[in-house]
Amino acid sequence: MGRRRGVELYRAPFPLYALRIDPKTGLLIAAGGGGAAKTGIKNGVHFLQLELINGCLSASLLHSHDTETRATMNLALAGDILAAGQDAQCQLLRFQVHQQKGSKAEKSGSKEQGPRQRKGAPPAEKKSGAQVHPEGVELKVKNLEAVQTDFSNEPLQKVVCFNHDNTLLATGGTDGHVRVWKVPSLEKVLEFKAHEGEIGDLTLGPDGKLVTVGWDFKASVWQKDQLVTQLQWQENGPASSNTPYRYQACRFGQVPDQLGGLRLFTVQIPHKRLRQPPPCYLTAWDSSTFLPLRTRSCGHEVISCLSVSDSGTFLGLGTVTGSVAIYIAFSLQRLYYVKEAHGIVVTDVTFLPEKGCGPKLLGPHETALFSVAVDSRCQLHLLPSRRSVPVWLLLLLCVGLIIVTILLLQTAFPGFL
């Protein structure tokens, strides 16, 4: 079997830091930029149409939303609303897709998976709110409210997350404060100090619990602004006591085939880079007691980002060295790995949604993971469907069935053989 590799779907004219996929429209939304520095590298949010053409997944640019001097570093999606972390502020965007009547989509295309250029495609960059009409599709992006979410000396929003019903969003940044805002008015409803130093990640559960991880080596569980508990990993974990670890990422995920079941997943990385780097760890936690259920090493490459599939079946990881991996959430066993797929830090990973357009786009594969990196590329990682029964077992059963049939015939009809 040949060496696994990711498929390059799209290459942007700027570094990519965040991506999301809209299950309703099949839009892949990738964002990034060069920041405020006058380097000639633009800032924007690109809307890509995912299509299955000749059995291969393809992405083509529908619309480019210019974010002027602000690079989008993190994204959250709630229906047709995007929450974009841009420097110290959170900007809400609303996008609308319309199929114009009397136009037919182009069905022909390359058999190779990857980016394709639409005929008569518009220039790569358009002003804010511009509309693009390739193949009868009209997409419009509108800036909604914006609010400053971080107030440190060097303010930067590090993470944004919607709650389960998309009525609230939570933000965290370098000042260590969690702030919760109403959607879409961005009226602040809650603020509290969660960590000393910057917040690395946060995730909201359906019961209202909020988990935050920070550079102060802590992972905390909150109910509104009240501390419920702190995760205790290293005390009983496999890591050596003289190796300081910090929590890098956290995500809630469903428990497959268990209605209402929930798990928390965290990634722990060494706080310092050593000549012989210690391993990073992936941990699954009980969402009621917040006690660790299972911990596995996930290699010596430092993990940069984490994603959980809709059903909670798979975990996706990206590393600072550009590698991408897919794990089974239940056993934390690695199923897929591409070393240095990007060659530079992977900034975000996300799974193809399992509802809406997702199953149609997935085709015969079990799951699909998308990754973006500072190298400006968006890659696709496909996991082939696993056989439910091993081939050797099927062959053994067939042989056994033949032997049993012969014995029965011999018993029923003596002298048959």
Swiss-Prot record:
First and last residues of every WD repeat: 152-191, 194-232, 298-337
Topology of the protein relative to the lipid bilayer: Single-pass membrane protein
SUPFAM superfamilies: Quinoprotein alcohol dehydrogenase-like (SSF50998)
Region listing for Disordered, in residue ranges: 101-135
Lumenal side: 410-417
Pfam families cross-referenced by the UniProt entry: WD40
GO cellular-component term (any): endoplasmic reticulum exit site
Oligomeric and partner information: Interacts with SAR1B (GDP-bound form). Interacts with MIA2; recruits PREB to endoplasmic reticulum exit sites. Interacts with CIDEB; facilitating loading of SCAP-SREBP into COPII vesicles.
PANTHER family attached to this UniProt entry: PROLACTIN REGULATORY ELEMENT BINDING PROTEIN, PROLACTIN REGULATORY ELEMENT-BINDING PROTEIN
Protein name: Guanine nucleotide-exchange factor SEC12
Gene name per UniProt: Preb
